[in-house]
Amino acid sequence: GPSSCKADEEPCEYHADCCNCCLSGICAPSTNWILPGCSTSSFFKI
């Protein structure tokens, strides 16, 4: 859940590291209204 996510803009390697681990390797804010905690941009790793 979100409680286990790193803060936004923190480095990430896997999707589990943060709510949205994007291809840049940085945690991003949640941007998906339908699936909170998921981003509409690509994950670095699922």
Swiss-Prot record:
Iota-conotoxins bind to voltage-gated sodium channels (Nav) and act as agonists by shifting the voltage-dependence of activation to more hyperpolarized levels. Produces general excitatory symptoms. Gene3D superfamilies: 4.10.40.80. The modification D-phenylalanine is found at residue 44. InterPro entries: Conotoxin-I_CS, Toxin_19. The modification 6'-bromotryptophan is found at residue 33. Belongs to the conotoxin I1 superfamily. Its main location: secreted. Keywords: Bromination, D-amino acid, Disulfide bond, Hydroxylation, Ion channel impairing toxin, Neurotoxin, Secreted, Toxin, Voltage-gated sodium channel impairing toxin. GO terms for molecular function: sodium channel regulator activity; toxin activity. This is Iota-conotoxin-like Fi11.8. Expressed by the venom duct. The modification 4-hydroxyproline is found at residues 2, 11, 29. It is found in: Secreted. Disulfide bonds join 5-19, 12-22, 18-27, 21-38. GO terms for cellular component: extracellular region. The cysteine framework is XI (C-C-CC-CC-C-C). It comes from Conus figulinus.
